[in-house]
Amino acid sequence: MRVFNFSAGPAALPEEVLRQAADEMLDWHGSGMSVMEMSHRGKEFMSIHETALADLRELLDVPASHRILFLQGGGIAENAIVPMNLLGWRKSADFVVTGSWSQKSFNEAKKYCTPHLAASGKTADGFTRAPTRAEWQLSDDPAYVHLCTNETIDGVETFEIPDLGDVPLVADVSSHILSRPMDVAKYGVLFGGAQKNIGMAGVTVVIVREDLLDRALSICPSAFEWKTVAENNSLYNTPPTYAIYIAGLVFQWLKRQGGLAAIEARNIEKAKLLYDTIDASGFYLNKVEPAVRSRMNVPFFLADETRNEDFLAGAKARGLLQLKGHKSVGGMRASIYNAVPLEGVKALVEYMKDFERRDA
């Protein structure tokens, strides 16, 4: 029996994608091979690779000025890879910290430069807000400005993206990429692990403006130097072939859904239903300012936290899984990525109301 999976990542995949992957597992398109067995330089995999790149470019409307790279290492590795590729001769980069993930990025950058904290969204209740552009205190000549546009743990999503002129804006988009249209031209670099909205764990997507490819530090490993990866079409080292294949299937699924505008409308509906239920309740609480509440990751707390385990057990009995909040913040978290259907959110909301009634 399939359940409703609210995991923050690895996360739910579209059932259509899973069924297609199962059907093609032993014999991809008459090749007599599984994708797992293919040479990454063979014509079969190259067709998968090129189609995935083209579909992602189409979905996000990536301009010709930007290159799309498939790498390994996940979003955490990019926290080191970004400064090694962008610092050049500069000694500092600016960070807008809106949650746990941008804090990790800031801390990792200390190994390569002297990062400058341009703004923080931390309050007495934790990370509950996104500083406005007027609050950003940028340094004189930063190599780049780093922002995590959706904080998976804290549930803070930044929607308003400022124009920084000549300073490259770097965004960790791991947990909201492909959930809504984006103006890619505003960014110098976008990066994200695949295991939330793109596909399965194993591949990391980097979208980088081409004029930024000459800034790498000499200590940057060749396999993670964006210029080298770009010049070799993401094939400098053996890529995560099956993860790219699954990502490609997800891209095709998104196109069948009507693209990112249609997906965004669906995601807005799902998030509104869940937040409205929380806000109308006297039992559940979300601490994030409404204007920056994440559409993808919805943390919430029970009024009586001694009931947490009972809540999770009851949810599991109804086929509602992976609702436990991150260990650093506690409570609950429902991750409602693209592949989580509206029916799943409705089932969760019904359960939340039932649990509150029983508790009362």
From Swiss-Prot:
Localization terms from the record? Cytoplasm
Family recorded in the similarity comment: Belongs to the class-V pyridoxal-phosphate-dependent aminotransferase family. SerC subfamily.
Q: Cross-referenced InterPro entries, in alphabetical order?
A: Aminotrans_V_dom, Aminotrans_V_PyrdxlP_BS, Pser_aminoTfrase, PyrdxlP-dep_Trfase, PyrdxlP-dep_Trfase_major, PyrdxlP-dep_Trfase_small
* Enzyme Commission number(s) from the entry: 2.6.1.52
Q: What does this protein do?
A: Catalyzes the reversible conversion of 3-phosphohydroxypyruvate to phosphoserine and of 3-hydroxy-2-oxo-4-phosphonooxybutanoate to phosphohydroxythreonine.
Which pathway or pathways does this protein act in? Amino-acid biosynthesis; L-serine biosynthesis; L-serine from 3-phospho-D-glycerate: step 2/3; Cofactor biosynthesis; pyridoxine 5'-phosphate biosynthesis; pyridoxine 5'-phosphate from D-erythrose 4-phosphate: step 3/5
Give a GO cellular-component term. cytoplasm
Entry note: cofactor: Binds 1 pyridoxal phosphate per subunit.
**Known Gene3D superfamilies for this protein?**
Aspartate Aminotransferase, domain 1, Type I PLP-dependent aspartate aminotransferase-like (Major domain)
Q: Which cofactors does it use?
A: pyridoxal 5'-phosphate
List the NCBIfam families hit by this protein, alphabetically: PRK05355.1, serC_1
- Enzyme class per UniProt: transferase
Pfam families given in the database record: Aminotran_5
| Record-given protein name | Phosphoserine aminotransferase
Keyword Amino-acid biosynthesis on entry: yes
Oligomeric state and interaction partners are given as: Homodimer.
Residue positions binding pyridoxal 5'-phosphate: W101, T152, D172, Q195, N237, T238
Known catalysed reaction(s)? O-phospho-L-serine + 2-oxoglutarate = 3-phosphooxypyruvate + L-glutamate; 4-(phosphooxy)-L-threonine + 2-oxoglutarate = (R)-3-hydroxy-2-oxo-4-phosphooxybutanoate + L-glutamate
A GO term for molecular function: O-phospho-L-serine:2-oxoglutarate aminotransferase activity
Which controlled-vocabulary keywords does the entry list? Amino-acid biosynthesis, Aminotransferase, Cytoplasm, Pyridoxal phosphate, Pyridoxine biosynthesis, Serine biosynthesis, Transferase
BP-aspect Gene Ontology terms = L-serine biosynthetic process; pyridoxine biosynthetic process
Gene behind the chain: serC
Question: PROSITE patterns this protein is in?
Answer: AA_TRANSFER_CLASS_5
Q: Which residues carry this modification: N6-(pyridoxal phosphate)lysine?
A: K196
Q: What is its main location?
A: cytoplasm
At the highest ranks, the source species' classification is:
Bacteria, Pseudomonadati, Pseudomonadota, Betaproteobacteria, Burkholderiales
| CDD domains in the record | PSAT_like
